[in-house]
Amino acid sequence: QAASIPDPYDASLLSADSIMKKVIFFAPFYESIIDDYRADLYIKGKVNLRKKNHILRFIPTMFRIRKGVREYMMETYSDLHFTAPDIYDQKVKASVGTTSEFWELDGRLPEYFHVNIYASTLLYDKLLSPLAPNAMKYYSYHVDSVMGKVHDLQYKISFKPKSKSFQLVSGHMVVSENVWSVREMHFSGRSEMLRFNNMIRMGDVGESDEFLPVHYDVDATFRFLGNVVDANYIAALDYKTIIQKDPSRMDRKRLKSKYDLSESYTLRSDTNAYKKDSSYFESIRPIPLTVHEQDLYKDFF
């Protein structure tokens, strides 16, 4: 009797660690493979003041709150230019909303949309990535499921910290066999005042944006002295040009730690970027508004 062939879709037969070793091995190549890109960046943000008291207006990152209004919404449409290793130049072409500026979470909102998923840290060096060279010391991994065609499998792998720490995150990722690149990653974490969930979807295998994010979804809850603020941000990127490095000139050295952000990120606005109504966005919005979001605009405009 012939030995039975192992089922490639049986997650219980797979070692998450052996898959992750390959993903972690390739991460430094993929981290620095992009030299330059230009993209249209759309961001939609919503904020709900679940609980508030008079202290809320002293939070430095908070926008101006209107009396009796708990929910706010804002959209922006920008040109984003990235130059390696980590210089981002964002020019806002159009913005509309029931407030004149985004709520910046912990003052670092742009970084939630500038994640290099293959870097050893996530979000401004605060968090150790489950793809870091030393990640296996701090994270445990598990194969949840196997998807796709037999010659083009994708593995859904969950990760969780081995010990409690604000520097570690939990969540899951989907990785592609053969190339060992990431299709999407969900990670959640917390600091003293902020809890967040971040979903990043990457381009497809073989496409020019394979190693770049195409969609972000960030949920955060901020708690401070009796105030509770919920926020949700969705971002979509549409790449116009992508320049990859010549692989023969790349080495496996990690990029140096992020330097002072004031040097690496600039945000400018067209003088007439702010729109007085939301109709302009109808033509450029990549993600339609929900009925509730339309109502927020109707009440405001």
Model-derived regions, located:
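A conserved hydrophobic secondary-structure block that centers on an alpha-helix together
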Residues: 149-154, 160-172, 176, 181-188
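Structured extracytoplasmic
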Residues: 2-154, 162-168, 225-301
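Extended non-globular scaffold/tether segments
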Residues: 193, 207-208, 212, 222-224, ...
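A short, polar/charged loop-to-alpha-helix boundary motif
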Residues: 194-198, 229
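Beta-strand-dense domains in secreted/periplasmic systems and polymorphic toxin scaffolds
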Residues: 185, 214-216
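Extended lipid/amphipathic-ligand handling interfaces
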Residues: 171-173, 177, 198-209
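A short acidic/small-residue loop/turn micro-motif
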Residues: 189-191, 219-220
